[in-house]
Amino acid sequence: MTDPGNSLRIEPQPWMVESATLAVLDALAAVGVVARFVGGSVRDALLGRPIGDIDIATPAPPQRVMELLEKRGIKVVPTGLAHGTVTAIAGTPPRHFEITTLRRDVETYGRRARVVFDADWAADAARRDFTINAIFLDPDGTLHDPVGGLADLRACRVRFVGDPATRIAEDVLRILRYYRFEARFGSGLGDPPARAACRAMANLLPNLSAERVAQELVKLLDASDPVPALRMMQEDAVLSVILQEARRLDRLQHMIAIEPEPDPLRRLAALIEVDGPAAGAIAERLRFSNAWRDRLEGLAVPWPLDPRADDRAQRRALYRLGAERYRDLALLQAAEGSVSRERLAELLAIARDWTPPVFPIAGRDITALGIPPGPRVGRLLDAVHFWWETGDFIADRAACLAYLQGLPPPPY
């Protein structure tokens, strides 16, 4: 962590002084508007992690912010005027700045709230979700920490701002966000008041849209090690509400230890123990894309890969399954414990080094022999393809045509 010591000040980071950031800040400062960085960019900068989009807080009302930015030729999108939020897009490549007016939430209705804009930085911090997201940073590097986020960041502690139950009632998704933040920033132990509130209010999770649940689940699974947070979710009776099929934390832990890179969908396949139709039902329930649904179904048990077969059989499996599915299945077998580390390395090397060839003939080669289009063409093509595949893909076009001409004509 970039430690500010007792001065509550850090050296300005490169992202704070890049041209796009300065253009946005200068547009606001030109008329004396105060602007401070806040949220994930500040948190991640203090941890020395890469940052993405930049959040900025200001007392200026959103219409005034838009006017000042547009006057400088900066593109502005009114992403949430009712809640005081606009998005500025500046720089090359484009950088997004979410600029939100300081506010107090007067009434909340789930995700929605009736807000009042004001100039009270402490009140704005008090309405945020977690203390580590409520640290303000001036452009000169001065930190403002009204709710103790710096101490929590140092201690790897994820804590709600104020009363956890109140924060969750404002948006139930914060239950899932809490565990995701535990996976990214926590110690693995959890904050007892936060966990107690999540446990008590888990029955509200079915009210969330499937898309929001899926987004949080995928982000959680993409953490470097999500298992401690998932175990907390299991202990707190939260995981069973959103994914009752998640029973294989042991296999997921092994997957994380052997995988070459994180893959949230492959990790999900390791976490659940279901057949293809059940995997498809999970994907439908979570509103996954068709591609993700097909991929998850393809990684369901029973696994169509025998890791003990010889290399010739592995090439045939790789040809039929495709490289991505073959690698995923090999990793799942290893995570299950049925493949040694050494054998896994061999299987992954086959997938890396062998390029499946293209079948050298097509239906037109059969019709050129005088066989009319129809089922006979397909049966003959399948016969040659099977011979070519079982022969380890060695036969070239001439050999395939010779084999074709030697086949007896199939029955109608």
Regions found by a protein language model. Name each.
Residues 1-412:
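Catalytic cores of the polymerase beta-like nucleotidyltransferase superfamily
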